[in-house]
UniProtKB/Swiss-Prot annotation:
Full protein name: Formamidopyrimidine-DNA glycosylase
Entry's Gene Ontology BP terms: base-excision repair
Source species of the chain: Acinetobacter baumannii (strain SDF)
Source organism superkingdom: Bacteria
Family designation: Belongs to the FPG family.
Biological role stated in the UniProt entry: Involved in base excision repair of DNA damaged by oxidation or by mutagenic agents. Acts as a DNA glycosylase that recognizes and removes damaged bases. Has a preference for oxidized purines, such as 7,8-dihydro-8-oxoguanine (8-oxoG). Has AP (apurinic/apyrimidinic) lyase activity and introduces nicks in the DNA strand. Cleaves the DNA backbone by beta-delta elimination to generate a single-strand break at the site of the removed base with both 3'- and 5'-phosphates.
Amino acid sequence: MPELPEVETTKTSLFPLLNQKVLSVEVRNPSLRWPIPDNVQKLVGQRLIGLNRRSKYILAEFEQDQMLWHLGMSGSFRLCQPNDELRKHDHLIIQFEDQQLRYHDPRRFGCILWLNPETQGKLIDTLGPEPLSTDFHAEYLASKLKNKSVGIKIALMDNHVVVGVGNIYATESLFNVGIHPAQPAGDLTMQQIEKLVVEIKRILKSAIDLGGSTLRDYSNAMGENGYFQQTLLAYGRAREMCVNCETTLENLKLGQRASVFCPQCQPLKKLRKP
């Protein structure tokens, strides 16, 4: 699933479409997580004037309307020319003045929706702060983790706590600060929380700089792969040696997600604070 760095990179790669007018819209398959709106043709004649990201949503601002785009598990956008070969799972084609924008999604868990009061309230307003914003700091995170008994990794992946810290980047951040992913979130000391916040920000910034992580088939709208996966120290490395102590990395499931960790560098402390 694309995480925050991949969505940010995708958004940036769509910038060539800014200030271009929509000439036509073709819906080849409306059946995504939620159906593509019947009135999506309203975009015709409007210019794309803004692209922003909130959590894993791309917010596309047109002259009269706004749209909310989510890549789901396997979605991607691609900038194409009209004569480029169509792929089986190209579900939406928006023809701009100079290029086509195609939405491709084999598993169809993504969404293409209008951004309106209903979707704003349902999908946006309940989200936690952006991890790279000044709103995400140690004091804030400590207040959200207080008395939580769930594992810290599960807490970090809760979009009500902080957005966009998915499996890859939570795994790497916890490895780098030596915290076991199953450690009860409420047990972390303030010093650990401070280090964790700094590391989350560093990891995400680095991943964005490297174009995200291409683990299976992710690429941005220009067809370019990311390279952060080449720097991974824990994620996807179960049964390999820890780069720090040469202990064999282990894997456990937390919240239905694989969590790789080093039992030596990330010991699980079982006693909770009084």
